[in-house]
């Protein structure tokens, strides 16, 4: 899989991609990263990336022309182009799973007031992290990349993926490590019992309880999915 990030701030993107799991995935040749500063495609001598909005209003609007030129330089018939913007569909685990099937993913990071709307005609999907505004799309791009790359086969242990939060619409079960007694707060005895069936049942129960408590929206989806399977 190849992932290309179009950004004005490549110095923000590369450190994350060259660390931890992302670096391991690159080293294992499971993913290839490319970061393009689309400022280089500006045609004026000042390399102007934004301009005032037609019709007035506050803030500067990112010019579509240099971004389209950057797209033309890196896009192939196998590419999926994703614009990162607050009005996009909220990113989720199923979306990350779907993106793993993409041969070439291109992520466009915005900044300032937003994009010239004519750019929207040239993208395949619009993604956001949620109902809030960030200064730029780089954090969104890195979140999408991390969530997607770690699902690529061979990047991390398959068993770890099975028990992660959001699989089957449930949060992960609570985890504990040493010491056993932390200022009187002890690890649940069942986890020390050695009875794997009881431990598995306990963890499933905790998943249900935690999801209902912390993410009732997910819990409703879990129940709906369960009812659907039982029909």
UniProtKB/Swiss-Prot annotation:
GO terms for molecular function: tRNA (guanine(37)-N1)-methyltransferase activity. The keyword NADP does not apply. One of its GO terms (biological process) is tRNA N1-guanine methylation. The keyword tRNA processing applies. It is found in: Cytoplasm. InterPro entries: Alpha/beta_knot_MTases, tRNA_m1G_MeTrfase_C_sf, tRNA_m1G_MeTrfase_TrmD, tRNA_m1G_MTases_N, tRNA_MeTrfase_TRMD/TRM10. It is an enzyme of class 2 (transferase). Its EC number is 2.1.1.228. SUPFAM superfamilies: alpha/beta knot (SSF75217). Gene3D superfamilies: 3.40.1280.10, tRNA(m1g37)methyltransferase, domain 2 (1.10.1270.20). S-adenosyl-L-methionine binds at residues 110, 129-134. Its main location: cytoplasm. Keywords: Cytoplasm, Methyltransferase, S-adenosyl-L-methionine, Transferase, tRNA processing. One of its GO terms (cellular component) is cytosol. It catalyses: guanosine(37) in tRNA + S-adenosyl-L-methionine = N(1)-methylguanosine(37) in tRNA + S-adenosyl-L-homocysteine + H(+). Belongs to the RNA methyltransferase TrmD family. Specifically methylates guanosine-37 in various tRNAs. Homodimer. HAMAP family: TrmD (MF_00605). PANTHER family: TRNA (GUANINE-N(1)-)-METHYLTRANSFERASE. This is tRNA (guanine-N(1)-)-methyltransferase. It comes from Mycoplasma pneumoniae (strain ATCC 29342 / M129 / Subtype 1) (Mycoplasmoides pneumoniae).
């Amino acid at each position: 899989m190849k992932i290309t990030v179009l950004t004005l701030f490549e110095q923000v993107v590369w450190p994350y991609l060259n660390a931890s799991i992302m670096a391991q995935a690159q080293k294992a040749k499971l993913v290839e990263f490319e970061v393009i500063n689309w400022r280089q495609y500006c045609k004026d001598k000042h390399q102007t990336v934004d301009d005032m909005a037609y019709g007035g209003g506050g803030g500067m609007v990112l010019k579509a022309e240099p971004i389209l030129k950057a797209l033309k330089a890196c896009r192939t018939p196998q590419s999926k182009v994703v614009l990162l913007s607050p009005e996009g569909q909220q990113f989720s685990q199923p979306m990350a799973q779907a993106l793993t099937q993409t041969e070439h993913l291109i992520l466009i990071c915005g900044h300032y007031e937003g994009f010239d709307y004519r750019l929207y005609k040239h993208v395949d999907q619009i993604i956001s992290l949620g109902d809030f505004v960030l200064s730029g799309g780089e954090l969104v791009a890195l979140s999408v990349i991390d969530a997607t790359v770690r699902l690529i086969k061979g990047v991390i242990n398959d068993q770890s993926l099975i028990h992660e939060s959001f699989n089957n619409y449930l949060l992960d079960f609570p985890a504990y490590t040493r010491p056993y007694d932390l200022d009187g707060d002890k690890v649940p005895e069942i986890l020390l019992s050695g009875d794997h069936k009881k431990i598995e049942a306990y963890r499933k129960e905790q998943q249900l309880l935690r999801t209902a408590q912390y993410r009732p929206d997910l819990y409703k989806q879990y129940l709906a999915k369960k009812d659907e399977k039982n029909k």
